[in-house]
Amino acid sequence: MQEIENLHKSVLLQEVLQAFAPLEKGVFIDCTLGLGGHSKALLSQKPHLKLIGIDKDKHAQEIAKERLKAFEGCYHILSGGFAKRFKEALETHGEQIKGVLVDLGVSSLQLDDDNRGFNFHSHALDMRMDLESELNAQKVINSYCIVALEKIFKDYGAIKEYKKIAHHIVERRAKKPFKDAKDLSDFLSSLSKNKKIHPATLVFQAIRIEVNRELEELKEFLQDAMKLKGAILCVISFHSLEDALVKNAFKNYAKNCICDALNFKCTCSNNHALGEILTKKPITPSLEEIKHNRRSRSAKMRVFQFKP
């Protein structure tokens, strides 16, 4: 277990604890429990909270249970996608929910596991958070039509040469299907001379988002989160697509006027804000944290306080 403590470093841990410092009692939902790092630290400080942890990854759940042993009876783990499970928890617990955390990153345990296919050197081409899901990276890269590949590379990777990359992938797989992540990564490296970032980075991001429905799930969650009352919502994102969704959702939550933009005059009474944004700019990791955990460098945390 000490090996897990050393391997997995919860991103922006102190900042998360600070965000939820006002909490004393009630239900806390960790929508992306992972290995339980954030939840363990929070329960250590707030023993009167009741934790609901949600995760798709059953292996991660087992590790989280082991790490949360000291809090037996204070937590409950739900398996599945966080949008669906959060909606169910919201219907059950309503205004008892006082805090919600969403950490959209992939854990080091998943990234470093060669059998999961998340890293460039994996001898697998999978990328599923939920290993019971039917769609995996191999199906995407070896069977999606060129138009579908272009769309996910453009929409989920913001790749400038999305047409060219999709064309080369389809051309190559016709001769020999991609067998693992290393095979795909090496092929992508042969197409690009970009030295700033690994040529496979954005393609892998796009495929992972597609396989796990990451943006759709985040959109669904943010829509349901509007129903929270008196709760603190904290979301940690790791790329601009996620952060833009969170930023825009929080702006909409904080809007007083909901009149049509074409209206010359407000007729809605101008008091529809659901709460306030507590982070005018996103909180990012300190240089010290990045030094000890390079994977934290792209993290951005936004916090919203809902009115009772």
UniProtKB/Swiss-Prot annotation:
E.C. number(s) listed in UniProt: 2.1.1.199
Catalytic activity: cytidine(1402) in 16S rRNA + S-adenosyl-L-methionine = N(4)-methylcytidine(1402) in 16S rRNA + S-adenosyl-L-homocysteine + H(+)
InterPro entries, sorted: RsmH, SAM-dep_MeTrfase_MraW_recog, SAM-dependent_MTases_sf
Sorted UniProt keywords: Cytoplasm, Methyltransferase, rRNA processing, S-adenosyl-L-methionine, Transferase
GO cellular component: cytoplasm
Enzyme superclass (EC): transferase
Binding annotation for S-adenosyl-L-methionine: G36, G37, H38, D55, F86, D103, Q110
Molecular-function GO terms, alphabetical: rRNA (cytosine-N4-)-methyltransferase activity
Entry's localization field: Cytoplasm
A Pfam match: Methyltransf_5
Family affiliation: Belongs to the methyltransferase superfamily. RsmH family.
PANTHER family assigned to the protein according to its UniProt record, in alphabetical order: 12S RRNA N4-METHYLCYTIDINE METHYLTRANSFERASE (PTHR11265:SF0), S-ADENOSYL-METHYLTRANSFERASE MRAW (PTHR11265)
Annotated protein name in UniProt: Ribosomal RNA small subunit methyltransferase H
Organism: Helicobacter acinonychis (strain Sheeba)
Lineage: Bacteria, Pseudomonadati, Campylobacterota, Epsilonproteobacteria, Campylobacterales
